[in-house]
């Protein structure tokens, strides 16, 4: 496959990685690590993306870690950070990894200029020197080294806490950087929750983010068996904390669409993601819709919110034979289909 632009600029600078024990993190979307592994002493990946983890897990040449925090011991002496779309997530990853790996760790940062990668210059200032060494494909390549003792990292310090009010219920939300709707109540989610019928049985919250939708559903329908899934380890950690903050019970786990779900559900409810990195991305939502019937019970129901311009109805109609519009405003529509 062709490499992403950040990987292409990294490919031009392979000499930086010769003889190094490299840990790759951030917004990595291609299989460039296999090529990089040929030039490094060792190559490992820390990813918060479950789909990407599954792609590399089991390969002998690359050790792959998935989670919201790197906890495993490692002999890494260089970080290759692909700049994520959220600046706060970049700061989270940088602080966490340098606290783990310590002084004298080298770092390479690559990213598209429009993603704000230039922010690394100020962000890294407390750790040591960093400079830009290459520009190509509208991307930048930075190299630096941690020459100061990195402060200790406590994940609890990184949760943003806020409240969501819905129909006389107050939900306490705890959200890590990089999680959808970080710090606010998404208007699409609000319309979805206003439109939902009474829920029963097993309910799946797909793309759970910080756990707002799942927590409201469980608060209003306390007898449901709630599964909450997301591809992001940061979202999983956030949803677990949000449930805990509201004394609610739910089963929260990573899943690449239906890869790890075990149930047939009475309801699949979703505010599905369509921004992956800086590009609009539909494939996971298409799979959610296409395979929904085989993951629903008899007369089970799919209900989702989407931006009005997204062409989901034809996919839903093909899967179910019909697609109903339950509600809409000037930006969002609520779609439903029954098995």
UniProtKB/Swiss-Prot annotation:
* The organism's place on the tree of life at top rank: Bacteria
Q: Give the keywords, sorted.
A: Cytoplasm, Methyltransferase, rRNA processing, S-adenosyl-L-methionine, Transferase
Give Gene Ontology CC terms.
cytoplasm
Instruction: Report the main location listed first in the record.
Output: cytoplasm
Q: How does it assemble?
A: Monomer.
Family from the record? Belongs to the methyltransferase superfamily. RsmC family.
The record's section on NCBIfam families has: PRK09489.1
The protein depicted here goes by the name Ribosomal RNA small subunit methyltransferase C
């Amino acid at each position: 496959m062709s490499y992403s632009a950040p990987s292409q600029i990294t490919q031009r600078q392979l000499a930086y990685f010769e003889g190094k024990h490299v840990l790759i993190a951030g917004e990595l979307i291609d299989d460039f690590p296999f090529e990089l592994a040929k030039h490094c002493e060792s190559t490992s990946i820390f990813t918060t993306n479950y789909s990407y983890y599954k792609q590399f897990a089991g390969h002998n040449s690359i050790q792959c870690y998935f989670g919201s925090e790197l906890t495993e011991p490692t002999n890494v002496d260089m970080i290759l950070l692909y700049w994520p779309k959220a600046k706060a997530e970049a700061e989270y990853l940088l602080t966490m990894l340098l606290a783990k790996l310590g002084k004298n760790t080298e770092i390479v940062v690559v990213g598209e200029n429009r993603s704000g990668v230039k922010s690394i210059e100020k962000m890294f200032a407390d750790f040591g020197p960093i400079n830009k060494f290459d520009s190509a494909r509208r991307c930048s390549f930075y190299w630096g080294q941690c020459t100061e003792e990195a402060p200790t990292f406590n994940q609890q310090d990184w949760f943003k806490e806020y409240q969501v009010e819905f129909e006389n219920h107050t939900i306490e939300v705890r959200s890590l950087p990089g999680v959808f709707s970080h710090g606010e109540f998404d208007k699409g989610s609000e319309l979805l929750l206003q439109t939902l019928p009474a829920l029963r049985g097993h309910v799946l919250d797909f793309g759970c983010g910080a756990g707002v939708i799942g927590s409201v559903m469980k608060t209003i329908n306390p007898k449901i068996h709630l599964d909450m899934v997301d591809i992001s380890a940061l979202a999983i950690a956030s949803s677990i904390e949000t449930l805990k903050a509201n004394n609610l019970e739910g089963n929260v786990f990573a899943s690449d669409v239906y890869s790890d779900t075990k149930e047939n559900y009475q309801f699949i409810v979703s505010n599905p993601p369509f921004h992956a990195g800086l590009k609009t991305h539909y494939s996971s939502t298409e799979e959610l819709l296409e395979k929904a019937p085989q993951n629903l019970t008899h007369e089970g129901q799919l209900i989702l919110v989407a931006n009005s311009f997204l062409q989901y109805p034809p996919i839903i109609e093909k899967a179910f034979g019909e697609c109903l519009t339950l509600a809409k405003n000037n930006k969002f529509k609520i779609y439903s289909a029954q098995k």
